[in-house]
Amino acid sequence: LTHGVRWVSELAYHDFITKELPENEFFGDLVKEKLIYYPTVTREPFRNQGRLTDLIVSGKLCADIGLPQINPETDRALMCGSPGLLVDLCNILNGLGLKESPRMGDPGDYAIERAFVEK
């Protein structure tokens, strides 16, 4: 789970994801075992810094979390963000060989959450 923001104060779900979810009585153990949370900030110092697009293209994101680079055989993505970010991410993922799910119900390697996208 990546979360890219400008300022640390915009990491609205950081404490929930890092403190509350792992202690959930029903699925906390799964969160501790499987969830990788990678928050990144662009405009002030933070342990992870930079735009998600740059971190993906450079390979730093996957290197930081200890996973292989993005691969259409093994990876899937759900994206939410500004229209510009989504265009950039689609171009990057397409370049890596992933295919967009054309519509709900049709399989693809990634999908875009469009509920909050303004044009």
Task: Give the location of each predicted region.
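Reductase modules of NAD(P)H-dependent flavoproteins
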Residues: 2, 9-119
